[in-house]
Amino acid sequence: MVRPANCNWLNYEGEIAIVIGKTARNIKMADAHHYIAGYTVANDYGLHDFRDTDSGSMLRVKGADTLCPVGPGVVTDWDFRNKGMRTIVNGEVRQDGSTEEMAWDMHYLVADMARLITLVPGDIILSGTPAYSRTVYPGDVVSVEVEGLGTLTNHIVSSPEPVSDEVGAQPTATEEVLSTALGGDWEFRGQRRPNSTQKEALPYPLVRPRYES
C-alpha cells in the first residue's frame, strides 16, 4: 500500500469481497447465491486526508492507486455464516469480528446492488468492516484474516512523490478528517469530537435480514 508523501491518514478496513460469476439484474435475494462465483479477502483502505473533499462519494478516499487489495484467491464453496474476521497490524489484533455481526448478509448485498446496477462476471462487492478502523503508517504490516478464506497481507510504504498541488483539492487534517481516521481515539486527545460520520453511526436496521440460501 502506497501512501502519498504529503498524506497522513491511511486507514485499514478488513472486509470480505463477493465476486460475481453471472450477469445479475433485478434478482431475488433467495436466488442471489446463483450469481456469486465465490468470496475472497479485501482491505478497503481509505485515504482520509481527502475526506472533506469526497464526503459522500469517496472517489479519492477509496480510489487512489494501490488501495483496495483483494486475495489471496477466490473460494467458490464457502458458507459465509458465522465466520470470524480479524485485522492485525504488526502482530496486534485491531479488528475482531464475525459475519454474524454484519448489518446485511452477502445475498442481501448482491440483490440490493442488482436492483439498479447490472452486475457482470468479475464485479466485486465489499461487505463492510468491523469496528475499529484506524490509521496505519509507513513500515506497518497489515493482515486481514477471514475464516475459510485465508489471509491478505500488505506492507505500508510512503511514496516519494506528494499529491500534486497544481490542481484539485489538497490533503487536509480537519476535525472531520481526524474524527474519522482516529475514531474513538479522537476523544482521548482531549479534543471536541464533531458529529460522527463513521459507519457505525449510519441508520442500520435493528433487525437484520434473515440469511437465505
Give residue spans per PLM region.
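Catalytic-pocket segment enriched in acidic/His residues
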Residues: 48-213
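Generic beta-strand structural signal
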Residues: 1, 8-16, 37-38, 66
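Short, conserved beta-turn/loop elements at beta-strand boundaries and strand-helix junctions
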Residues: 21-25, 161
